[in-house]
């Protein structure tokens, strides 16, 4: 087969201007980016699949060669498979996410269980300890994501949870400020890449159309963590032994995480093609339904520098990073809640129950958000923007209300706490709105760095000199975290709508021209091979794959 002309080839390296027509991405001098040539083809073109390098192919390519004669699922079979994935993959991820946030919240509950007295720290040092967690979180992003791409996902997740189990247990040995700082730093380090890993996993098993609906379930597990954690904290205060309540709390949480680690080691999937809880036929259908819906690959273990560059040049990457930075400036409210409750004359014992009520409110909000997203689809920006309204209202009430209105202040604090819904929506949207495994991981790193930097700053806004009203912290939250953030989401939507209009116009002219890619590479024997491949079989970025339509 003749090689496509240079005029038909797209140079990835130079395609940094996302506002141009995709047809303009042509470099007649360079011809193509090494190993990948994108060409528009006709129906009569060859559809053969030569033996090309794994650097180009998606990880599940070989597995999917067995699905060439796969018969389409009936609606009933598709529903049965989808619900099986919900009760295996989604439940597993929700449990992991819940324990991840319970571990983060251990310090918050320990603050009312005797931590301050046993370790001789004050409120400002408590804020510094929270900051150190996110310093470790930032430092762990790049090495964590590199390990994630290099090693099997299941082993990476199990190793991370095993390390954080050990660190949680070691908290019981801490007796001063320095010890707590070191432990929280390393806890942030080992937990740093787990949230992006879970997002990558959900992207392997569910198409974009379903991912947006499933994201609020992560919010349920995130804020729902305060329900079991609150009851555990409530119970340990009745324990009659020589162990401090906060240490007993750490031991119980560490024990639960230990058993979770064992389960993850055996059952967490590396990718769709190796999931133990699915039959071989179910794995084939799962990969097939994700590919056909997303028009993109699922996983690649080869690091691609050009995808990193493309991610950094994409303005959407930076807008998502800026959004999560603004949003998470208010995240320390979750760590301050128990202290705020006690400052309103709620006892240590009862503050744990108020925390449970707050978690219940947030879970109900997440269920409502999920229902709204299932009814009004492909409107992530508007759904996210709407859920900032309760936070703004609650924040203004906290600032404006007299401190004597204790019940009103409690209610306002709880109402203000559901800013996590837009965070979860944007977390899923940031990875769903790009393609290319290295690009997804790069965008995930940027997103988590923005998340971590905001959480480094956040604790420092709650200075003891501003107690008990903490006006500076509330003003930053109202003005930046909850008022600027929704506009960032709307700007992202505006950009993606413009891109989709151009792509849909091209696909309307001739869809099949943009669904295949011409590949030239060297196989394992050193031979030069080339041929046309379906885009869904390859690890292409959204900029290379013109059949990729951005979810809104």
From Swiss-Prot:
Any one GO biological process: cysteine transmembrane transport
Pfam family, one: MFS_1
Membrane spanning residue stretches: 83-103, 163-183, 185-205, 216-236, 248-268, 353-373, 381-401, 410-430, 444-464, 472-492
Keyword rRNA processing: no
Region feature Disordered, mapped onto this chain: 1-23
InterPro entries referenced in this protein's UniProt entry, alphabetically: MFS, MFS_trans_sf
Protein topology in the membrane: Multi-pass membrane protein
Keyword Transmembrane helix: yes
Keywords tagged on the record: Membrane, Transmembrane, Transmembrane helix, Transport
GO molecular function, one term: cysteine transmembrane transporter activity
Family membership noted in the UniProt record: Belongs to the major facilitator superfamily. Allantoate permease family.
Protein name, entry field: Uncharacterized transporter PB10D8.01
Organism, as annotated: Schizosaccharomyces pombe (strain 972 / ATCC 24843)
